[in-house]
Amino acid sequence: EPYRRQRQMCIRDRPETWPDFSLKKQTTPYEYRYFLNVCTFGYTTPYWDWERWEKEIDWMALRGVNMPLATVASEAIAERVWLKMGLKEEDIRAFFTGPAHLPWHRMGQLNGWDGPLTDGWQKEQIKLQHKILNRMRELGMEPIAPAFAGFVPTAFAERHPEIQFKHLEWGGFDEKYNAYVLPPETPYFKEIGKLFIEEWEKEFGKNTYYLSDSFNEMKLPVAEGDDDGKHKLLAQYGESIYHSIAAGNPDAVWVTQGWTFGYQHDFWDKASLQALLSRVPDDKMIIIDLGNDYPKWVWGTEQTWKNHDGFYGKKWIFSYVPNFGGKTPMTGDLQMYATSSAEALHSANAGNLVGFGSAPEGLENNEVVYELLADMGWTADSIDLDSWLPVYCKARYGGCPAAMDSAWQRFKETVYSSLYSYPRFTWQTVVPDTRRISKLDVSDSFLQGVELFLSCADSLESSSLYVNDAIEYASYYLSLIHI
């Protein structure tokens, strides 16, 4: 089972009674410890049942997560809203994608693909979300719920020919799958947004944090060079999104992903982002600066918070995207993960930094990364990997022989010294797409690390997690050089 293989630590040789230890108080410098990614609900969790969700929520609680993303059942609530707006059920269902594509539907990038959703699906998602939210709240977490971002079904656009809807494109999909977004000045924006919050809270109870992203990886349809028009439109959208949320719950806080501000850094210059934020109260917005690992390894820029002066007074969360697209190869810049957030925390330019987060698009891979990031949420300082890795090995495998320590030194210097968003095995490059091929480490040093890891079998073979990782690392290396 994937959960047993990855999302746990070792309980081998557990004593009948535990020895006394002196108490140590560990505090966090962060008000919020965020976890999950909109895309996780497509790459990993779309078909999870309550049993699997319960384990993941327990995993979060044990690592101090207090602000998880919770978007299950978004479409069931949206369906109620669109029915109240006069649409027919079949037109609403045609708007939704299939379950595995719902993250991109929620961000307005994709409609109708692999849909529709069934009545049974909608009802079961409501039941599941009740269990998810109840458990999160029982454990002291404040979940981030979805909010209206302006995207409407084609049937709604057809009912209102008087409105000049803006058409947004994404990913090269045909126009019939693209989004129509309400112009910010129409009263429908506030009306629909208010209805969504009300319907959500009627079903699931009061919530404080609501996620809304209107332009993720999409550009506004504005004339090239018309900066004044662009900034005016962005300011209107920021104002409309905020007021549509506040109309449903005056105490609510608008949460938005900062991914696209770095991903499309040419579009989101300082003046453009300042315009979007300009009409939103500072205490009513949180920006999740999602992918602080991508400026170095993919975009070739400064980290987004640096480019935008700590987000101009808004609260923000320092986060990484340690997994892209649910990929499984061993990758991740451990040294960056052990230092970069601490550097931000102590920066004079950090602005109102209030949280730390991990936003993997896919789970059940590279567990060392998730454990390291969980620990970074509980320290204001960098972590010394030479000291931390043996502790990790003891927790995961029940021991750390000298050969294990040496193995992880080699892993740290090879596969875990970089991050690649599109890693490919040899068998995946028969028809190569050079834009999406990234280096995978096949060095002698990595092979030595695998051999050293396997040499620990005599002392650690009773650890199921050691056996799991030994098989995974060996098969991973063989797949790189032979397949």
Each predicted region: which residue ranges?
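Catalytic and substrate-binding clefts that recognize carbohydrates or anionic sugar/phosphate headgroups
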Residues: 24, 48-51
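Active-site-adjacent substrate/metal-binding segments within catalytic domains
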Residues: 30-49, 60
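Single conserved hydrophobic/aromatic residue that forms the stacking wall/gate
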Residues: 1-7, 11, 482
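N-terminal carbohydrate-binding accessory modules
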Residues: 12-31
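Catalytic and binding regions of secreted/periplasmic enzymes and modules that target cell-wall glycans
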Residues: 415, 419
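Histidine-centered catalytic/metal-binding microenvironments
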Residues: 424, 429-481
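Catalytic-core regions of glycoside hydrolase
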Residues: 15-17, 36-40, 61, 66-412, ...
